[in-house]
């Protein structure tokens, strides 16, 4: 998921 990727980046 895009959201999951975003959280991983953080």
UniProtKB/Swiss-Prot annotation:
Location, primary (coarse class):
secreted
Keyword set, alphabetical order: Amidation, Neuropeptide, Secreted
Is the keyword Secreted in the record? yes
Q: Output the InterPro entries linked to this UniProt entry.
A: Tachy_Neuro_lke_CS
Native species: Gadus morhua (Atlantic cod)
Top-level taxon of the source organism: Eukaryota
The similarity comment for this entry is:
Belongs to the tachykinin family.
What taxonomic lineage is listed for the species of origin? Eukaryota, Metazoa, Chordata, Craniata, Vertebrata
Q: What does this protein do?
A: Tachykinins are active peptides which excite neurons, evoke behavioral responses, are potent vasodilators and secretagogues, and contract (directly or indirectly) many smooth muscles.
**Protein name as it appears in the record:** Neurokinin-A
Can you list the GO cellular component terms from the UniProt entry? extracellular region
GO BP annotation list: neuropeptide signaling pathway
List Methionine amide occurrences by residue: 10
Location in or out of the cell: Secreted
May I ask which residue range the UniProt record assigns to the signal sequence? none
């Amino acid at each position: 998921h895009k959201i999951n990727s975003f959280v991983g980046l953080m």
